[in-house]
């Protein structure tokens, strides 16, 4: 009897609770009003009393293309609520059994979409929970009225600037339909995020949910109230099983009807072939949702062309796994010949969206009709700051030098350039976006925008140059220390071999060669360091030039003294005299090569006051006495001369500020990354591997000077044409000058009088005697 009374009381309490479900959000609803759309499917909305997703009441409404239309649809499906605005949800949700229009039953299909929240009554900002070690922040811009996506990006970047992850966020100050003037957000450290994730996993089986015991059948409804952490996140839907104990009678009836729909032979059991056919047909319907574009406006910004899968699990972990599987799929247009612009999410390239011409079928499912929804779906499962490898530059600067110094330096150099390229790419994208937004601005405002980005680019270039200079100087100092250690060790071994009793000449000569090679590398490092400083900072090079020459003289003296010790040991120098002479010839040859190399370098950079030809020649004469045996600054061993990328070589960089290399103005939009040439800041090629800095070059205004090579060729061609015209004109004038008028050939007798001779000349020039002419006319 007691059990019956308890059961009746429980039923009465449940009935009372159901009857008292309020219709005003301020009084509390079991679920927040939301609508979800998937083109080709019937619109879905949440039943605020049960928390379940239900299809459109009319069974005809599908995806809507405008925010005003979405607001109107919210008002239609929730007539009892005062819907005043809509806003995108922060997280995608999974909806089970979402059928295409015209179908009543479908199973085992989960669709992941980003729903719209229908805001009730006067706007009230979301109550965000701030866990331990987290920070609550907000930003408002009264002169801006931006979308949900814009403010989500602002919050995400703000957390990233603080080396934290975006935990939760909400909109502030509505200024239109799905438009706002600010955002509030919570940033948490990565460790706190992981702790909260583990706490949520432990609480997955909990039935605590604001609204009652119906949470087993709810679908990821977002309740934004100041509740505990496990209530702040999406509620965990569970799998609905046919044999679950305590299942309500209504669910049993629906399951029986579904089995009967697939029971074609009347045996009372589900026909698996029919079910498989239905699933295959549903798969075709889903492909049509991606492939058919005739019925869908490509410009609809709210079309949730999301992703589908054939799994029955609906835990939050499985939803994130499905989203990750599709969002991380590689770009594939498919075999079909359609050409539909879409967006795909590149998780490898810094969570960036790229445009993709989707073929309509057979391609990857990672394609979205707008960048907005691509980011909304895919960014939910990607942390704000993806785990990145430790900064190689910091690691290099903090780690002491070892035998792998050159390899560590190369790795740090590549990391530095990659970071610089990433920064420049980000600025380029921001510049292009600002350019698009500034098309209708006055010319003065455009100039301000251009100047701001010019300053930003220049600051990035100067920062990168400073970091490069620090990296190279550190590498030079470490190489010098390593060379000193090697030289000291080689000299100690050489002296030890000389002091042996009796000494072994061949062994002594071998150690002497090692010591000489160490001195050569020290000298080569010193010269390269001076050339680098002379290139990037001539004033500093002028200051250190005396120290460089002194160091080279010290190297020469040490080598001469070491060779002198060889002749103090009886019998050793005589046994290896031939090798010593060969070493002397190599010294002379390498000295000449070094002199030529120095001359070439000086000419390539232009004659300057630091290293004039005559002065350097005198210095070489002083430092390279030919009568010395192994001494001389110019001595370079064949095994180490002009050797590429050895541990003793330092590769100079161009660390000059940007204004010395040309300041960019603005990027040109619409160019592929392959078409954008590389901006290469490089030093002269001095027969050694040099520090070449490659990054993507911003292509700027047309007034920037183009290729000088084309201008030179044009001038040369023009000069040749002008010279040809002048020559032809002179020839023609000269020919005309020597041309005379002749009406015939007249023989002149040498015995005639001067008067007759003069008359003959006049007749040659066309003179006619009027008397003769008169009589000729009379006779005729």
Curated annotation (Swiss-Prot):
PROSITE patterns: APP_CUBD, APP_E1, APP_E2, APP_INTRA, BPTI_KUNITZ_2. GO terms for biological process: axonogenesis; central nervous system development. Keywords: Amyloid, Copper, Disulfide bond, Glycoprotein, Membrane, Metal-binding, Protease inhibitor, Serine protease inhibitor, Signal, Transmembrane, Transmembrane helix. It comes from Dichotomyctere fluviatilis. InterPro entries: Amyloid_Cu-bd_sf (IPR036669), Amyloid_glyco (IPR008155), Amyloid_glyco_Abeta (IPR013803), Amyloid_glyco_Cu-bd (IPR011178), Amyloid_glyco_E2_domain (IPR024329), Amyloid_glyco_extra (IPR008154), Amyloid_glyco_heparin-bd (IPR015849), Amyloid_glyco_heparin-bd_sf (IPR036454). Residues 392-583 form the E2 domain. Residues 1-18 form the signal peptide. Residues 194-316, 648-669 are annotated as: Disordered. The chain crosses the membrane at residues 712-732. The record marks 171 as: Required for Cu(2+) reduction. This is Amyloid-beta A4 protein. Glycans are attached at residue 560. Cu cation binds at residues 148, 152, 169. Residues 733-780 are cytoplasmic. One of its GO terms (molecular function) is transition metal ion binding. Functional neuronal receptor which couples to intracellular signaling pathway through the GTP-binding protein G(O). Residues 323-382 form the BPTI/Kunitz inhibitor domain. Residues 240-300 have a biased composition (Acidic residues). It is a single-pass type I membrane protein. Coiled coil: none annotated. Residues 19-711 are extracellular. Belongs to the APP family. Residues 29-190 form the E1 domain. It comes from the Eukaryota. A motif (YENPXY motif) lies at residues 767-772.
């Amino acid at each position: 009897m007691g059990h019956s009374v308890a059961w009746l009381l429980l039923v009465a309490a449940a009935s009372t609770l159901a009857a008292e479900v309020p219709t005003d959000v301020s009084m509390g609803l079991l679920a927040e009003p939301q609508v979800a759309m998937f083109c080709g499917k019937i619109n879905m909305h949440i039943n605020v009393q049960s928390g379940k997703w239900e299809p459109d009441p009319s069974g005809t409404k599908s995806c809507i293309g405008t925010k005003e239309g979405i607001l109107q649809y919210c008002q239609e499906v929730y007539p009892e609520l005062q819907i005043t605005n809509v806003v995108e949800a922060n997280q995608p949700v999974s909806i089970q059994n979402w059928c295409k229009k015209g179908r009543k039953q479908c199973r085992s299909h989960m669709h992941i979409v980003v729903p719209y929240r229908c805001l009730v009554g006067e706007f009230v900002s979301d109550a965000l929970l701030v866990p331990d070690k987290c920070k609550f922040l907000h930003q408002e811009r009264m002169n801006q009225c931006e979308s949900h996506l814009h403010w989500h990006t602002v919050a995400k970047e703000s957390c990233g600037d603080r080396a934290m992850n975006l935990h939760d966020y909400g909109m502030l100050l509505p200024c239109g339909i799905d438009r706002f003037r600010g955002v509030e957000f919570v940033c948490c450290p990565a460790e706190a995020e992981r702790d909260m994730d583990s706490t949520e996993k432990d609480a997955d089986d909990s039935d605590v949910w604001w609204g009652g015991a119906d949470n087993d059948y709810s679908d990821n409804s977002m309740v934004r109230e100041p509740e505990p952490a496990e209530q702040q996140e999406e509620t965990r839907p569970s799998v609905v099983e046919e044999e679950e104990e305590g299942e309500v009678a209504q669910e049993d009836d629906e399951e029986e009807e579904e089995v009967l729909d697939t029971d074609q032979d009347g045996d009372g059991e589900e026909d698996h072939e029919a079910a498989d056919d239905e699933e295959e047909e549903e798969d075709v319907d889903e492909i049509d949702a991606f492939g058919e574009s005739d019925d869908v406006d490509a410009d609809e910004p709210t079309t949730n062309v999301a992703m589908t899968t054939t799994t029955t699990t609906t835990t939050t972990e499985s939803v994130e796994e499905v989203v990750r599987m599709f969002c991380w799929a590689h770009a594939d247009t498919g075999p079909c010949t359609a050409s539909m612009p879409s967006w795909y999410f590149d998780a490898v390239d810094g969570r960036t969206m790229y445009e993709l011409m989707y073929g309509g079928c057979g391609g990857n499912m990672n394609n979205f009709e707008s960048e907005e929804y691509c980011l909304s779906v895919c960014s939910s499962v990607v942390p704000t700051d993806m785990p990145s490898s430790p900064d190689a530059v910091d690691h290099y600067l903090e780690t002491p030098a070892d035998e792998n110094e050159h390899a560590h330096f190369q790795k740090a150099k590549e990391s530095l350039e990659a970071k610089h390229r990433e920064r420049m790419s980000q600025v380029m994208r921001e510049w292009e976006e600002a350019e698009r937004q500034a098309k209708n601005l006055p010319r003065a405002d455009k100039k301000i925008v251009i100047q701001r980005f010019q300053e930003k680019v220049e600051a990035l270039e100067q920062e990168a140059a400073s970091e490069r200079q620090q990296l190279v100087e550190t590498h030079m100092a470490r190489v010098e220390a390593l060379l000193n250690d090697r030289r000291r060790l080689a000299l100690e071994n050489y002296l030890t071999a000389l002091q042996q009793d009796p000494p072994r000449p061949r062994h002594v000569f071998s150690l002497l060669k090692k010591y000489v090679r160490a001195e050569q590398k020290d000298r080569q490092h010193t010269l390269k360091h001076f050339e680098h400083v002379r290139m990037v900072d001539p004033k500093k090079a002028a200051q250190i030039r005396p120290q460089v020459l002194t160091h080279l003289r010290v190297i020469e003296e040490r080598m001469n003294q070491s060779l002198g010790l060889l002749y103090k040991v009886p019998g050793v120098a005589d046994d290896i005299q031939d090798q010593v002479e060969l070493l002397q010839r190599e010294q002379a040859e390498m000295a000449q090569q070094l002199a030529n190399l120095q001359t070439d370098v000086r000419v390539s950079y232009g004659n300057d006051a630091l290293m004039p030809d005559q002065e350097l020649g005198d210095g070489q004469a002083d430092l390279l006495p030919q009568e010395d045996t192994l001494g001389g600054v110019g001595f370079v061993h064949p095994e180490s001369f002009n050797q590429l990328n050895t541990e003793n070589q330092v590769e100079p960089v161009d660390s000059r500020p940007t204004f010395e290399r040309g300041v960019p103005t603005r990027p040109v939009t619409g160019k592929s990354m392959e078409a954008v040439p590389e901006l290469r800041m490089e030093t002269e090629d001095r027969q050694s591997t040099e520090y070449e800095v490659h990054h993507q070059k911003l292509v700027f205004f047309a007034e920037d000077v183009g290729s000088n090579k084309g201008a030179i060729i044009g001038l040369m061609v023009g000069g040749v044409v002008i010279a040809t015209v002048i020559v032809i004109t002179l020839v023609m004038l000269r020919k005309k000058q020597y041309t005379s008028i002749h009406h015939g050939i007249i023989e002149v007798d040498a015995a005639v009088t001067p008067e007759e001779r003069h008359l003959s000349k006049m007749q040659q020039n066309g003179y006619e005697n009027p008397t003769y002419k008169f009589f000729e006319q009379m006779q005729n």
